[in-house]
Amino acid sequence: MLWNPTRFCENGYTPNRHPEWASALSMLVFYPCIARALQLQLYATVALLGTNMLSSMSTHLSQGMAADNLFFVTVDYIDVVTTVLILTVGLAEIAARIVPWLNAGIIAVLAIVGLATQGLSDELSTQWSGSVVAALFTTTTMSVYVVCRRCDGRGTLTLVVAGMLVVLAACAKLLADEPGALGLPVDEHGCNAHTASWAHALWHLFSGLAVLTLLGLITR
């Protein structure tokens, strides 16, 4: 039986009255033991990606990378790790909604392995706006669930704030990559070095805040 958000909002949640939640990872917000199991899974993901990050950082240090560039590489990897966590929770929630009897953890593990085996290199993290994609993905798939779960306006307000952060992140990314499209002066390569440095930092700031906002919304 599919989850009925209206009935849930009217009657509140109790395991006996809503047995369809029993096989879904979506009940992790109500059952600490399942939340703990998911935490362990996420810790394993962070450990996997952290090893990759340290390996890349050591390579850059050995090649004499400047400290500011090393900072941006670190931020890139933090974005990728956060993206994996968001996609893991999001895919698990979607699987629990569509096929309640399916072990959504299997899909989550496949998502982690699929992303990890692609290398998660600097090229991936800089060319693919992972945080923005994850924020849009999560906002779309989780909005009804989050808003109806608590039956208050906080979920809606948080979604609005996250959406604004996503828009700001997208604008900063456009400013960093395509300054000419916004009427700014560019060199022969189509770049504006002065604008690109701080616009890139703003992109990381806004996209990271959007992801963290949504992560707090999902787990509250």
Task: Identify the function of each model-found stretch.
Residues 2-220:
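Multi-pass alpha-helical transmembrane bundles in non-GPCR membrane proteins
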